[in-house]
Amino acid sequence: NNCPQDWLPMNGLCYKIFDEQKAWEDAEMFCRKYKPGCHLASFHRYGESLEIAEYISDYHKGQAEVWIGLWDKKKDFSWEWTDRSCTDYLTWDKNQPDHYEGKEFCVELVSLTGYRLWNDQVCESKNAFLCQCKF
């Protein structure tokens, strides 16, 4: 694994939690600027969710929810990853996603589920966030 020391290696990619709270779009831009090819994290199987959840529980300071790279760009429940990978796996918290009040189009890991399950949230909300990079 070529990941820097405080990054989590998984399936050839590296993941890191950033505690600084940002709106979803600012978080995605931060990941992209960190290094070419970086994005907010995408998930493709349950095992990844569990490994990430454990990593975040160990390293995340504070109770903030955590942005990941999934969003409903078209606002019609057609969820897309910012790294353009296939949306082949979803693990929503109960009764989610709900586009609550027609305003929630970005996806966060829910702290009350141990960061295992997802909720759609207002994109302007300030959250911690998870970047995914290749090194």
Curated annotation (Swiss-Prot):
Gene3D superfamilies: Mannose-Binding Protein A, subunit A (3.10.100.10). It comes from Lachesis stenophrys. Disulfide bonds join C3-C14, C31-C131, C38-C133, C106-C123. The keyword Metal-binding applies. One of its GO terms (molecular function) is metal ion binding. Belongs to the true venom lectin family. It comes from the Eukaryota. Expressed by the venom gland. This is C-type lectin LmsL. Galactose-binding protein which recognizes specific carbohydrate structures and agglutinates a variety of animal cells by binding to cell-surface glycoproteins and glycolipids. Is a calcium-dependent lectin. Shows high hemagglutinating activity, that is inhibited by lactose, galactose and inositol. Keywords: Calcium, Disulfide bond, Hemagglutinin, Lectin, Metal-binding, Secreted. Residues 10-132 form the C-type lectin domain.
